[in-house]
């Protein structure tokens, strides 16, 4: 599953906490569009399951942080090797509204920075795995944030969830299409020297 992503997610570890531990931040989209059920049982549930599998299979010398984002981005848990605690916060994630991918990247960079030994080399110290379905609707531009990550030597690997047939019902009862913006996520990965994937089905995700 996500260990395919992890295979190229391992950063250089100069200066990170505990010397030999890699730092990976899972940035998980919890916007309303992630509640679409074109990927069964829903985009967000498939993304959460992918994150949980990643956590379970990650090597023990990995510090994992979690950032969740809708119209705001926030660190849900600082980078840690406590897999049970990480799994609890991922399981509890629920969808909101809005999509602030740029803000999520900045929050993930802050999470990496906080896990790095200040006496060491902070360059190339972490990797971000961005699980989302698409387009930034609020906050700072995602390409600007990706460029900041690139300048710090932090790779961003992206996974786009959903199909062109995805829809959601808004709070006022309107059914609106929510196709994934695969190109936007690919652009982020390109700028930050990562790789991008698309998961139109849960089976697709297992092939990553």
Predicted regions and their residues:
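Short beta-strand-loop
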Residues: 18, 40, 63-92, 106-119, ...
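Extended, hydrophilic extramembrane loops/domains of integral membrane proteins
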Residues: 181-208
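Solvent-exposed, acidic/flexible segments
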Residues: 20, 40, 44-48, 57, ...
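An amphipathic, basic-hydrophobic helix/alpha-beta surface used to engage anionic
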Residues: 1-56
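Sec-exported extracytoplasmic/periplasmic mature domains
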Residues: 32, 52-63, 91-95, 109-117, ...
């Amino acid at each position: 599953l996500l260990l395919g992503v992890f295979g190229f997610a391992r950063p250089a570890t100069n200066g990170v906490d505990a010397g030999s531990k890699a730092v990976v931040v899972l940035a998980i989209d919890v916007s309303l569009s992630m509640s679409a059920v074109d990927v069964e049982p829903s985009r967000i549930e498939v993304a959460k399951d992918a994150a949980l599998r990643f956590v379970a299979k990650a090597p023990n010398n990995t510090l994992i942080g979690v950032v969740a984002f809708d119209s705001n981005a926030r660190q849900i848990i600082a980078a840690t090797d406590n897999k049970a605690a990480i799994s609890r916060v991922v399981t509890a994630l629920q969808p909101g509204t809005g999509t602030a991918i740029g803000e999520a990247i900045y929050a993930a960079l802050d999470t990496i920075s906080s896990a790095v030994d200040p006496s060491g080399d902070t360059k190339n110290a972490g990797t971000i795995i961005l699980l989302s379905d698409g387009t930034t609707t609020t906050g700072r531009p995602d390409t600007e944030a990706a460029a900041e990550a690139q300048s710090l030597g932090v790779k961003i690997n992206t996974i786009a969830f959903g199909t062109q047939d995805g829809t959601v019902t808004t709070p006022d009862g309107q059914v609106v299409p929510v196709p994934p913006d695969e190109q936007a996520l690919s652009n982020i990965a390109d700028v930050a020297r990562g790789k991008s994937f698309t998961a139109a089905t849960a089976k697709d995700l297992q092939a990553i």
